[in-house]
Amino acid sequence: MTLYPKLIEEALATVIYPGTKKNLIESEMLADTPSINGMKVKVVLLFPRDTDPFLKSTVKAAEAAIHYHISKDVEVEIVTEFKSAPRPEVGKMLPQVKNVIAVSSGKGGVGKSTVSANLAIALAKLGYKVGLLDTDIFGPSMPKMFGVEEERPYYVHKDGRDLIEPVEKYGVKLLSIGFFVSPTTATLWRGGMACSALKQLIADADWGELDYFILDTPPGTSDIHLTLLQTLSITGAVIVSTPQQVALADARKGIDMYQNDKVNVPILGLIENMAYFTPAELPENKYYIFGKEGCKNLAKEMNVPLLAQIPIVQSICEGGDDGAPAATKVDSITGQAFLSLAQSVVTVVNRRNAEKAPTKIVSTHK
């Protein structure tokens, strides 16, 4: 069997690079003409950066494609090269970002992502420059909530580096791993790979100047949270919970993580989501389905502000499902509620910055 470069390139054209959703040839990742010596083939693939989370899987796919489309007898050597300048050191990332706000919850299903999306949009409505990072690598929801599931971020060349350009909607710059993986496919990554992808979304993106960088974190306390704490100086954390005691118990754990002596991230306040239900036909009535004022009592116990009590409202749920969060409708009752929340966050952030030094990044050394 005689091998020739075009044959190799045709095989590589069947491999899709997840970073662009194009094949390796269309993505211009073939650095040079494949080198052939008998049944030995050398391919040089050019990746945007050495931290690319898709590097190993793409290399394996390229090798498998050559074996499948040409012959298993081909001895394949794949060399990787990188075209970006080194990313900034930890501690020097995102120097143009003024405030980094982590929106957290101890338990899933309390509406944390809904709060994150609406808070980011409300801050933008107030005139601030806002970025929103969906840090839930295994369960991203922001593309759906913003109605941008079909969008794909592209790369821009800036300061000697190829950077991901965030998707922008409702005045908010947005990135999520959901833009790079299929919405119907589970992300089966170990913690290290997930954290590497998260770092790429932070350090290898063109976030530009931001007044507020909102981090929609996954529930609980995990590798993702630790990576954020080791990568960014977090101005403060906002804790979201329902009034239910089982949710409040996990909210305490989230607060404890940020208040740990090695972390010391200020708690900006608590948000009580699903605080009560008011039927449209009985607007004066409040039904406390999940308990009454649980977050208010916890906030008092922890000596932190209660930033908002958000009721169960059908339009809030529908807005997230339809890609038009409630905060986009500034004239509605729910839109005004999220504007009020945003104003409260601005107030506590300004107070925190006036009274406390910037948060130190958690050391990676024991």
Q: For the regions a protein language model found, what residue spans apply to each?
A:
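Extreme N-terminal, non-catalytic leader segments
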Residues: 26-29, 36-37, 41-104, 342, ...
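Conserved catalytic-core segment of NTP-binding enzymes
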Residues: 59-60, 211-212, 218-318
